[in-house]
Amino acid sequence: MSSQIKLTKNAYRLEKVKLSRLETYLPTLKLKKALLQVEVTNAIREASESIQAYEAARESIYAFAELYSVPLYVDAIANSFKIEKVEKDYENITGIEVPVIRNIILAESSYSVLDTPIWIDTLVAYSREFVINKVRSEVAAEKQRILEEELRNVSIRVNLFEKKLIPETTRMIKKIAIFLSDRSITDVGQVKMAKKKIQQRKEESECA
């Protein structure tokens, strides 16, 4: 693209304006990159903690696997795994929208306390904890993915500014400046030469 730019004063002015804009915007990009790095670190920690909680809840379920399969109480426990609604919102982090869980509504487990053993309450509690932590881990993973993708994109732009756009624009400004300077010197030389020829012709005409 730089080879297509004309070596003129107007082109020089435009390249100077372009460089000024690039150098003005770069600090903003670098700040966003730094903030995103912090947010990604936090998101990774949050996702890791959510996965650990989910896996711990799953282990609790496995520990009572035989009780979950008792035909007489399957229906009483089944609803504790059902999600009626996940209320999600989105918050803005460094200009990017990321999901946030506001509430997880589970189906009501309807069973008679008198007609079921006491351990049913424990199984229902474990079941609900398992489902809630599963949803939280999924949303935390989604948040992490979104922030990591944005960080990659911003990092690419910072690298583009630092390694390509600013150096190329700077080189083009120097190239145009050198060309204009050389042309100015050439023009001055040509003017002097023309004046010298005019003077010579004048002197020759006076001698004649």
From Swiss-Prot:
Question: So what does this one do?
Answer: Produces ATP from ADP in the presence of a proton gradient across the membrane.
The gene designation is atpD
Q: Which domain of life is it from?
A: Bacteria
What InterPro entries has UniProt attached to this entry? V_ATPase_D
Gene Ontology BP term (one): proton motive force-driven plasma membrane ATP synthesis
Which keywords accompany this UniProt record? ATP synthesis, Hydrogen ion transport, Ion transport, Transport
Q: Which organism is it from?
A: Chlamydia caviae (strain ATCC VR-813 / DSM 19441 / 03DC25 / GPIC)
Protein name (Swiss-Prot/TrEMBL) = V-type ATP synthase subunit D
State one molecular function term (GO).
proton-transporting ATP synthase activity, rotational mechanism
The keyword Ion transport appears for this protein = yes
Return the Pfam families for the record.
Answer: ATP-synt_D (PF01813)
Q: Which family does it belong to?
A: Belongs to the V-ATPase D subunit family.
Keyword hit for Nucleotide-binding: no
